[in-house]
């Protein structure tokens, strides 16, 4: 018959959502734009700026850890923490 369903490898199971949780309801608006791609660069530039700022932050932490940055009055020893 032309109207009969064919036996495919995927069964016809209706999607039944799981338990609706408060966290799921809170996060649902964040996923509402999923799959929609705007033309152009979008927020790529903003992401690049934040990545650069984060890299600068990490470099500052590394310089403090390696004592490359001289901080007057700050000792870098575990004994000073116990006092």
From Swiss-Prot:
PTM statement from Swiss-Prot or TrEMBL: Phosphorylation is a light-dependent reaction catalyzed by a membrane-bound kinase; phosphorylation occurs on Thr residue(s) in the N-terminus of the protein.
Pfam families, per database record: PsbH
Residues annotated with Phosphothreonine modification: 3
InterPro entries xrefs: PSII_PsbH, PSII_PsbH_sf
Disordered, as annotated region: 1-21
One GO term describing the cellular component: photosystem II
Function noted in UniProt: One of the components of the core complex of photosystem II (PSII), required for its stability and/or assembly. PSII is a light-driven water:plastoquinone oxidoreductase that uses light energy to abstract electrons from H(2)O, generating O(2) and a proton gradient subsequently used for ATP formation. It consists of a core antenna complex that captures photons, and an electron transfer chain that converts photonic excitation into a charge separation.
Family indicated by similarity: Belongs to the PsbH family.
Protein name: Photosystem II reaction center protein H
């Amino acid at each position: 018959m032309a109207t009969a369903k064919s036996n495919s490898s995927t069964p016809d199971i209706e999607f039944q959502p799981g338990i609706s949780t408060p966290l799921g309801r809170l996060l649902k608006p964040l996923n509402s734009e999923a799959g929609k791609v705007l033309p152009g660069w979008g927020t790529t530039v903003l992401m690049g700026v934040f990545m650069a700022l984060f890299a600068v932050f990490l470099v500052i932490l590394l310089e403090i850890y390696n004592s490359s940055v001289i901080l007057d009055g700050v000792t870098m020893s575990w004994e000073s923490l116990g006092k």
